Amino acid sequence: MRNFTELYRMDLPHRAISVYIYLADRANKDGICWPSISTISKDLKLSESTTRRALKDLYRAGLIQTEQRYRENGGNSSLLYRL
C-alpha cells in the first residue's frame, strides 16, 4: 500500500500507522524489510512494548505478515516483515 489514504481511513491507533509508514519506507520493491524491534523503536522514539503492540495491530488488520529469521548458528534474528 503506497497510497496511505486507505491506511488513514482504517480504525488503527496512531502507533500502528507510524510503524506501517516506517516499514513501507524501508521495504524493498517486493514489500519486504527486516528491521529489529529495537531499531524501529529507536528511530520512531517509541518504547519497545509500544512498537510490539503496533506490530500486533498491523498483523491483526492484515497489513503485514511476519516470518522468523534465523542466524547461521540457529539463533533468532529479527523478524521479516512482508507488507
Regions found by a protein language model. Give the residues of each.
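Short recognition helix of helix-turn-helix/winged-helix DNA-binding domains
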Residues: 1-65, 74-78
